[in-house]
Each structure stands twice: as structure tokens, then as C-alpha cells.
Amino acid sequence: MTVDWWTIGLQVINVSVLIWLLSRFFWRPICAVISRRQQEIAAQLAQVTDGQKQLEADRAAVKEARSSFEQERARIVQQAQQEAQSERQAILAKAQQDAAALEAGAKQSIAQEEAENQARWRSDAAALSCDIAGQLLAQTGCCRPARETLFDRLLKAIATLPDRERLSLRDGFTFATATAPSPDERQAYESALMTAVGEHPVITWAVDPALVEGFAVKTPYLTVASNWQADLVRIREGLSHAGH
């Protein structure tokens, strides 16, 4: 068998040229496309990875926000419960205070009403007692020594008046008696009154049965009394205020 080295050489050259052509105009573009595609795929994978990371971060943020919301909700509910409890306690305390105030006011009103009733009863009882005593004294009359005592007391009351009031009696006054005096008694009373006043005033005589027994010196601005009616009034006032 004969080997044609020129043919083999030409074939080798052809194959080498073909390989060079393929590598230059076919494999390189294909490799470039494959490389570019690989880069795009890697970029997309990186984007997917970043997206997954972002999604995980978003999920974590949502979870954290949800946890924060739950904590805030629990805090708000607890605060609302505390405020409701505080308001309830305040309402109960206010109601208790109002009830205590109403009770105290009612007790005070009842006590005041009882005191007023007792005072009215004492006043009515004292007035009735003094009216009965006055009627009995008016019916039984007065003995001369008692009348003289009442007149002496009148003179002492005039003597103890302030100077201005006592001197005003010199301008004249009304001398009231429970019963009409006899001429001798009238003269004695007039003489004693002039001595007590210090001059000779004009005396207007009057009979006032309401005095029960005794005397009264009266001017438009002054009254000096020494009679049972005045004594009964003082006794009645004393009895009316005895329980105060």
C-alpha cells in the first residue's frame, strides 16, 4: 500500500483551516453567546436571590410589625382596662361621697327640724304657761307690798339709765299702771318720779291692764318697765331658750 503524503498533508491543512475557521467564526460567537447567556442567567439568579432576600426581609418586617401591633394592641387593651377600672373606682367614690353628703344633709335637716320643733314646742309651752300665769295673776290681783316692790324696781331702773336717756324724761313721759291708782297713790308716784328724774316733767297718766300688775314709763324712744307682763315675757323667753 502506497501512502500519498501530499494528499495527507493537504487534508491536514484543510482540516486545520476548517478548525481555524470554525473556531473563529462559529465557536467563538457561540461561546460568547453562551457566556453572555450564562451571565444573564447569573444576573437573573442574583436578582432572584436578592428578591428572595428582600422577600425574607419583608416577611421579617411584617412579622416584626405584626408582633409590634400585637404588643401595642395588648398595651392599648390593658390601658383601656386600667382607665375603665380607674373611672369605675372614681364613679364609685363619687357616688359614695354623694350618698354620704345626702345622708349628712338629711341628718342635718332632720336634726334642724327636730331642733326647730323642740324650740317651737318650748316657745308654745312657755307662752301658754305665761298666759295662764298672767291670767291667774290678773284674776287674783296684787297685794300692796308687791306693788310697792314693783314701783321701787321702776325707780331703780330709771336711776340706772344713761344720763342722756334719763335726762330725756324731763321733757315728759307717759306713766302707765295696770290699775287706776288712788289719789294718794297717784300723788306718791308722781312725787317719787319727779325726784328720780330731777325736775317736774309733764306726766301723762294711762291705765294698761295688759301690764297685769306694775308700771311702765314710756316715751316715743324709751320704755322703762317694771311689771308682771314684762316679767312674764322675760320668763317666757328664758324658757324658750332654755334648751339652746
UniProtKB/Swiss-Prot annotation:
Superkingdom, taxonomy of origin? Bacteria
**Matching InterPro entries, A to Z?**
ATP_synth_b/b'su_bac/chlpt, ATP_synthase_B_chain
Q: Keywords for this entry?
A: ATP synthesis, Cell inner membrane, Cell membrane, CF(0), Hydrogen ion transport, Ion transport, Membrane, Transmembrane, Transmembrane helix, Transport
Provide the membrane topology annotation: Single-pass membrane protein
Q: Which residues cross the membrane?
A: 2-22
On assembly, the entry states:
F-type ATPases have 2 components, F(1) - the catalytic core - and F(0) - the membrane proton channel. F(1) has five subunits: alpha(3), beta(3), gamma(1), delta(1), epsilon(1). F(0) has three main subunits: a(1), b(2) and c(10-14). The alpha and beta chains form an alternating ring which encloses part of the gamma chain. F(1) is attached to F(0) by a central stalk formed by the gamma and epsilon chains, while a peripheral stalk is formed by the delta and b chains.
Read off the PANTHER family from this record.
Answer: ATP SYNTHASE SUBUNIT B', CHLOROPLASTIC
Query: What is the protein's name according to its record?
Result: ATP synthase subunit b 2
List the source organism: Gluconobacter oxydans (strain 621H)
Encoding gene (name): atpF2
